[in-house]
Swiss-Prot record:
The gene is secA. It is a peripheral membrane protein. This is Protein translocase subunit SecA. Its EC number is 7.4.2.8. InterPro entries: Helicase_ATP-bd, Helicase_C-like, P-loop_NTPase, SEC_C_motif, SecA, SecA_CS, SecA_DEAD, SecA_motor_DEAD. Belongs to the SecA family. SMART domains: SecA_DEAD, SecA_PP_bind. It comes from Lactococcus lactis subsp. cremoris (strain MG1363).
Length: 865
């Protein structure tokens, strides 16, 4: 055994020994707690809170608090946490992940660390994969926490801001990861402190932590606003792609065949036009060169149409519902994701392909990755039955250790080696034969599929075989709880995509474990192909054999499965040829085949990890910028102090930039240069009568800066006099700063998003895209800060203040990728109207509209014309 593996095993043993000792100490309180009356046990909560207030740490209280919660669970829920569950709870309190097998009672395990950490009063967030589980767990476990005197809240997408605030103010809050992330983003877009809902992030306990922190981490959370509509171009590009000759991803056997108009890279799932395809495109769109700079936008539409038509598969990647809406199917759970949309125009391209109404494109206004959101918590932990395969990722990205926890009872499930068939047809025939055999014995069967399409194919074959069954996929997920509840009954046959009831127990019915033959005892799990992630396969197996129950699992594979096509089918085919195995019904069991499949899965997992890492690397670049902007917004919203000192700094830096810019462009002794500077100052800072050419002529650069700054201070004082009330002055200052910061920040992150889409091409020039992105984003950030300060100065100086009128400022219409909701933020009761003059603006001056662009590249185009 290599030293590194031996060391890891020894570390696990040491950790388990330590946890075992701590769990015994918790159990030593059992008799004392059992003899307490209900009132005495409930009184332990305020007593423990008082001890925390006097300086004791949560670690000091762990043994007693766990024992209190354990005894309360016995009285309220009728459940008493086992020794191994106490061990798991200690790992969770330490901010790590206990790997506990399916059915080992993770929900009950979580109650002890949740109770202990909630005693601090700083808030605990229990995070689930969907709202159904959040509601269920809050209802079931909330009874325990309420009995112990703690408050429990539920945060759902449908809740109003007031209801959300109430939920977050509870000791314990149940929510989904997406809703937590979106609430954080929304809190940093409001204009009043009272509109914020979240408290500082303290402790998050994530259920199915691998699903949330790993699988969902590839998709950033985005709040967006509407951008320009380009429906006609999407339809035109779609018409073009439908004239092309080639293969779809699901039937492709090689990347490219002679005469094809496009080629597909099966491993990376990317697509590009061949020379023949490019010729067709140039004729179709009547252009000379598809890849000319002036055709960049068209190329973008064509690339999306290619992906939509030949890479994105109906009922696998997405489905169309009865409202003619394209819904994404989560590849890891099989559930649809209402409200989420593919970015960068791909979703619109799919809508064009399916001939359904095309929704407007969106513009990013705020975004954060799952990784960077959860890394903001002071303490983060989670539970799952399948995390060891992603141990490196948890350690590197979240600084979390994985500790395997022993099962309470030995696992009795029989896990058979994979069976490999040459064709899909042969594989499905074997699957149906196995189902018939097991169904005849009354054994409950769960058939796991990767895609909706496969589940419907098997359902059709079972109908032909006259075997009654239930189908659980993205099209009828609303019946999930009911279907899973009956899946363990004698003779039940259930077909399910990967969603197969994560977090829900398949309880075995009467007589299911009594069969004389071990092969037919308990739930039989049949996998119809390997998923690209070993964790998903392990989760499917884990549906059977829960809590020491008997069970059996068997995977059926074919050389035509997608995973086999992408990685390794040629090698396996060659192996079969050498073994002289042929024929439709030929089947092989081999350790070599299993190792080859696991090797393929590791490669896919490696690719997916790299993809998530890259998403994080890009988000890390703007993380510091986001934190600075959000922190400054918070200061502006929460401050009770006059912001004049802050504004004076902005005015001074803006004046310095203007004078320095004109000095670089020309000589300050030159009359034309001074005239240009005067025009800029009069257009953006001061009334014409406040400063004259003669005052600036002959001055040095520093003297000009000092003179203009003195006059700006006087102008500012007169503006503030119109708002005699200090409170209204602060409202006005706050309204201007927030409006300018929000406009510029949303423009900035949208520009960064667009740059990220294109910066990858710089790799062809031997440049590191991440480094290029860092450098460009830093320059853009500095430009944004300059634009913010310029625009704040302009608005403060030029705004026509109407002191008697109070008009609420409303935020723009926005959309989240998970909720498609409108968010209206109400701002200060201050009216700001502005009169912008484009007269006498120098060509190279900043445009008075506040875009940050030069006048000649903005409003100057139309004004000069």
């Amino acid at each position: 055994m290599p030293n590194i593996i031996r060391k890891l095993v020894e570390n696990d043993k040491k950790e388990l020994k330590k946890l075992n000792k701590m769990a015994l100490q918790v159990e030593s309180f059992a008799d004392e707690m059992e003899h307490l009356t209900d009132e005495q046990l409930k009184a332990k909560t305020p007593e423990l809170k008082e001890r925390i207030a006097k300086g004791e740490s949560l670690d000091d209280l762990l043994y007693e608090a766990f024992a209190v919660c354990r005894e309360a669970a016995r009285r309220v829920l009728g459940l008493y946490p086992f020794h191994v569950q106490i061990m798991g709870g200690i790992v969770l309190h330490n901010g790590d992940v206990p790997e506990m097998r399916t059915g080992e009672g993770k929900t009950l395990t979580a109650t002890m660390p949740v109770y202990l950490n909630a005693l601090s009063g700083k808030g605990v967030h229990v995070v689930t994969v969907n709202e159904y589980l959040a509601t269920r767990d809050m209802t079931e476990m909330g009874e325990l926490y309420s009995w112990l005197g703690l408050t429990v809240g539920l945060n759902l997408n449908s809740k109003s801001p007031e209801e959300k605030r109430e939920a977050y103010n509870c000791d314990i809050t149940y929510s989904t990861s997406a809703e937590l992330g979106f609430d954080y983003l929304r809190d940093n877009m409001v204009t009043r402190a009272e509109d914020m809902v979240q408290k500082p992030l303290n402790y998050a306990l994530v259920d199915e932590v691998d699903s949330i922190l790993v699988d969902e981490a590839r998709t950033p959370l985005i709040i967006s606003g509407q951008a320009e509509s380009s429906s006609a171009l999407y339809y035109r590009a779609d018409q073009f792609t439908k004239t092309l000759k080639g293969q779809n991803l699901n039937v492709a056997t090689s990347d490219y065949e002679e005469g094809d108009d496009y080629k597909i890279d099966l491993q990376s799932k990317t697509i590009s036009l061949t020379e023949e395809g490019i010729d067709k495109a140039e004729k179709f769109f009547q252009i000379e060169n598809l890849y000319d700079m002036e055709n960049v936008a068209l190329t973008h539409f064509v690339d999306n149409a290619l992906r939509a038509n030949f890479i994105m598969l109906h009922d696998i990647d997405y489905m169309v519902d009865e409202n003619q809406e394209v819904l994404i199917i989560d590849q890891f759970t099989g559930r649809t994701m209402p409200g989420r949309r593919y970015s960068d125009g791909l979703h619109q391209a799919i809508e064009a392909k399916e001939a359904v109404p095309i929704q407007d494109e969106s513009k990013t206004m705020a975004s954060i990755t799952i990784q960077n959101y959860f890394r903001m918590y002071k303490k983060l932990s989670g539970m799952t039955g399948t995390a060891k395969t992603e141990e490196e990722e948890f350690r590197e990205i979240y600084n979390i250790q994985i500790t395997p926890i022993p099962t309470n009872r030995p696992v009795q499930r029989l896990d058979h080696p994979d069976l490999l068939y040459p064709t899909l047809e042969a594989k499905f025939k074997a699957v149906i034969d196995d189902i018939k055999r097991r169904h005849a014995e009354g054994q409950p069967i769960l058939i796991g599929t990767v895609a909706v399409e496969t589940s419907e194919l098997i359902s059709k074959k079972l109908v032909e075989a006259k075997i009654p069954h239930e189908v659980l996929n993205a099209k009828n997920h609303f019946r999930e709880a009911q279907i899973i509840m009956n899946a363990g009954q004698q003779g039940a046959v259930t077909i399910a995509t990967n969603m197969a009831g994560r977090g829900t127990d398949i309880k075995l019915g009467p007589g299911v474990i009594d069969h004389a033959d071990p092969e037919f005892r308990g739930l039989a799990v049949i996998g119809t192909e390997r998923h690209e992630s070993r964790r998903i396969d392990n989760q499917l197996r884990g549906r059977s054999g829960r809590q020491g129950d008997p069970g059996v699992s068997q995977f059926y594979l074919s050389l035509e499965d997608e995973l086999m096509k992408r990685f390794g089918s040629e090698r396996v085919s060659a192996f079969l040829d050498r073994m002289r195995i042929s024929g439709e019904d030929a089947v092989i069991k081999s350790g070599l085949i299993t190792r080859q499949i696991e090797s393929s899965q590791k490669r896919v997992e490696g690719n997916n990890y790299d993809s998530r890492k890259q998403v994080l690397q890009y988000d890390d670049v703007i993380r510091e910028q986001r934190e600075v902007i959000y922190a400054q917004r918070q200061e502006v919203i929460l401050t009770k102090e006059d912001m004049t000192p802050v504004l004076m700094g902005m005015f001074k830096r803006t004046i310095d930039r203007q004078v320095d810019g004109h000095e670089l462009a020309g000589n300050l002794k030159d009359e034309e240069t001074v005239k240009d500077l005067l025009q800029t100052v009069q257009n953006t800072m001061l009334p014409e009568e406040a400063i004259e050419l003669s005052e600036l002529t002959g001055l040095s650069g520093q003297a000009m800066k000092d003179l203009i700054f003195d006059k700006v201070k006087s102008r500012y004082a007169s503006q503030m006099e119109k708002l005699a009330d200090p409170e209204r002055q602060l409202e006005f200052q706050r309204a201007v700063i927030l409006r300018v910061v929000d406009n510029n920040w949303s423009e900035h992150i949208d520009a960064l998003d667009q740059m990220r889409q294109s910066v990858g091409l710089r790799g062809y020039a031997q440049n590191n895209p991440i480094v290029e992105y860092q450098e460009e984003s830093y320059k853009m950030y500095n430009n944004m800060i300059g634009a913010i300060e310029f625009e704040v100065t302009r608005l403060m100086m030029k705004a026509q203040i109407q002191p008697q009128t109070a008009i609420r400022q409303e935020a723009p219409r926005m959309t989240t990728t998970a909720s498609q909701e409108n968010i209206t933020n109400v701002g200060p009761d201050t009216s700001v109207s502005e009169e912008i003059s484009f007269e006498n603006v120098g060509r190279n001056d900043p445009c008075p509209c506040g875009s940050g662009k030069k006048f000649k590249n903005c409003h100057g185009r139309t004004h000069i014309a």
